[in-house]
Amino acid sequence: DADSVMSGDILVQMTAIMEANPRVGILQSAPKAIGRHSLYGRIQQFATYVYGPIFAAGLSFWQLGDAQYWGHNAIIRIKPFMENCALPVLPGDPPFGGEILSHDFVEAALMRRAGYEVWLSYDLDGSFEETPPTLLEELSRDRRWCQGNLQHLRLFLLKGIIPAHRFLFLNGVMIYGSGLLWFCFIFMSSLQALLDVWIEPVYFPTEYALFPEWPVWYPGWAIFLFIVTTVLLFLPKLLGLYLVIAKKRADLFGGAGKLVLSVLLETLFSVLFAPIKMMFHSKFLLLALLGQKVGWGPQERSDVGLSWKDALRFHWRDTVIGLFWGAILWIVNPAFCIWLSPILISFVLSIFLSVWTSRPTAGELFKRLGLFLTPQEMDPSPEMKILAEVLANPPLPAYPDFKLAFFDPWVNALHRSLLCKRGRLMPEVLKKALNAIDSKEALSKSEIMALLHSPAMLFELHKCLWESPKEQFVEKWSRYLSWI
């Protein structure tokens, strides 16, 4: 991917594994997060280094040769991939139809169906990637993944898919379905807490009853649910922390004390972020089921921070819900309101949390305090040093976007050769594009995408431009050069 880095050593090791095991079709590495300066990004980076190794080892233990492909930082055996992993266009409309958005899980399942294994090289170092710099950027990516994972339900009964990958398809859906289930659970629990106060228990529902019917409460079940939930959430973090200390690697995280404090703070932030993600995931799932389409556009990779305006636009509903929900519970059932306070506080603070954790200044503050440090910051590898030098160079000049494919013969020919479909010739769009050379705003996004996905229209547009009278073409070409 554009945000991926792999060392030469891990490429050589993975290639050797592929050569020694001809039945391995895909070998996936376990990338560590790098390059983030925002507080949110630094928290995610820290988590991948502390919890990532034990998580990846656990995945490899259970999946063995039925692992997942994550779409990047992997080595693929090309011939079986080309022969067996072509993605179908699903019939019908999104979310269950159309082009498959989350392609990697499907390609791994198709590779296994063809008899080749998919493995996770969890114990090899030297694989890196950038994570989203802000909470909203991560949620934007999650929305695309949500629709893509829903499409996997169409492939669940596909002939030849092994049970392990059928389960992974369901698990991918439950990543977002669990958020909706959690919301329903706390909503129904809140409703029950209100009814317990508003409705007096009836001890004798029938006349002339000899014995009363007492309200039943099962504290053992509640305690058991609380313990199981706590273990599932926090035991992996404790095991990851123990593993770092046991291997005497705490110095690479700023020392044992700073490491433990960072884990505690990461846990606190996770508790605050989880309800916000729950609300967004619930909305994503419902919107996808209602047929709202999403695309796969470019991702924001820079640590520029989030504006208060954008945060307010996306989080105001969470804040209002948190205030309204909390006020009702506090008035009617204060004890339950206190019990639910971690979730309600997260809703109320969602705007502030999203903005503050997106700021590089907040990330640098924690870095100066020695918190959320990672081994690549304490002892950077040669690849990270080279990457830092390259990123320190002035950026390349920006080029005009889609118009480059209109004018430039080389770009036009290359772009058309890379398109796998012929595309439809739409005269009205082509005519509008010819008039849009002078005004980029004249073309809508859908029209631009139609042009860029149609080799026939790109050829006709390019041909018309180059066959136009010399004076007109020179004028247009001069204007084009001024854009560079």
Q: Where in the sequence are the language-model features?
A:
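Short, Lys/Arg-enriched, Gly/Pro-containing loop segments at transmembrane-helix junctions
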Residues: 13, 250-254, 294-297, 362-370
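Basic/Trp-rich segment in TM-proximal cytosolic loops or flexible interdomain/linker regions
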Residues: 64, 131-135, 141-337
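Internal catalytic domains of large membrane-associated glycosyltransferases
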Residues: 1-160
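C-terminal amphipathic alpha-helical interaction region
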Residues: 300, 308-484
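Generic structural hydrophobic/aromatic packing signal, biased to beta-strands
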Residues: 27-29, 43, 76, 111, ...
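Short acidic (Asp/Glu) and glycine-rich catalytic loops that position anionic groups and cofactors
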Residues: 86-90, 119-124, 219, 301-302, ...
